[in-house]
Amino acid sequence: LLFIFNTVAFATNPPEGFTSLFNGKDLTGWWGLKTEDPSKWLSLPQEKFKAKWEASQKDIHKHWRVKNGILINDGHGLFLSTEKNYGDFELMLEYKTVAGADSGIYLRGVPQVQIWDTSKEGGKWKLGADKGSGGLWNNGPSGTRGRDPLLYADKPFGEWNHFHISMTGNLVSVRLNEKLVVHRA
C-alpha cells in the first residue's frame, strides 16, 4: 500500500480480524516510493535495492513524522509505502486534510483513492474536488468507472474522515464515512 498523505493518519487498536499497519510510534515497516510499481524495486539486484531503500529511509524521515500517535507529512518528499506487499485486502484508516490538499492512497501502485480539500477555497474544484474524495483518481479520464465518487461523503473541512477500502483482484470498493462512493470499479 502506498500512502501519499498531505494530511495526517493515526494508529488505533484495529478491529477484530485487522492488523495495524502503523505502530503509532515511528516509521517502522514503511519506506518511501514515488508513484511507481513497487515490484520494480523488488526485482533490483540486492545492492541496488539496499541503496534505494536507504535513500528512501532518509527521505521519509525528513518529510514524515509521528506526533502523539499521529502520522504527519509536510506535503513533500516520497510517498509512504508499506514494506510488506498485500494481495486482496481491506484497509481502514482515518485522515484529516490540510488547506489545498490534493492527496491519496495508491493501492498496489494504481489506482489512487483520491483525498481532496473539497472546499471551494481549496482551489481544486476545477480538478474534481467538488465531487468529493474517494474516487479512483489517476485511473483513467473523466467518465471512467470509479474515477468520480458515486456521491459526496466528505465531512466538513478540518474534521476526521474514515475510509474503508477493499481490493479484490483489480476491483476496488471504497466507503467514505460509511457511504459507498466506489463500487467494484
Please describe what each predicted stretch is.
Residues L1-N6:
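Bacterial N-terminal signal peptides
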Residues F10-A185:
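Carbohydrate-interacting regions of secretory-pathway proteins
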